[in-house]
Amino acid sequence: MDIPQTHAAQIAMEHRLYYYGDLHVFGEYPSFMKAFQKERGIVLDITKEDLQYLKEGCVDYIGISYYMSSTISSIETDDSIKVAEGFYVARNPYVEKSDWNWQIDPQGLRYSLNLLHQRYHKPIFVVENGFGAYDKMENGEIHDQYRIKYLKAHILEMKKAMVLDGIPVMGYTPWGCIDLVSAGSGEMEKRYGFIYVDKDNLGNGTLERKKKDSFAWYKKVIESDGEIL
């Protein structure tokens, strides 16, 4: 089936975001997911009591993790990644990317906050936002200006969403305070923290901790309530 690119993006948004959001905020399965399940002969073992629990357990606010934006295509290419039947994550040539090919898109955070508020009208908590990178020790120091640049740009876009767009953002926490094994790739060397930990992918190292440049920078950010970036 030939799917227009804009429609492919819409379907991907429904299945990867709205499906979960609608369940938690509205307390019911969205119509597009009911149609998807019916078309494939999927019958959920769910009772009226279960549906009532869904209705009674709706959330008071939305917590989101934002690291990157995704570009969706219905056309498969050599470097695309299949995410579902007929849908692929494609490379966006207009944004930078990390060492792990994650798209660096601060404006996407502002867009996402607007999108979620327009659909759900709930306060939003950005619970994860961070930059995974190879950190190199130089004379006993880690000068991770790339991480500062990433976080600063995303915080600025979040502030625009709050001040210019009126989005009720209730909080922000970066990922993360200290290096640990990446849940996404299983690597220690994909580092997110403000504090460096001497350990490699094979578990070798002293476990010595060292503050990166981003540690002092973020300390000023939170002390000033985001005014000093």
What are the functions of these language-model segments?
Residues M1-L229:
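Active-site region of glycoside hydrolase catalytic domains
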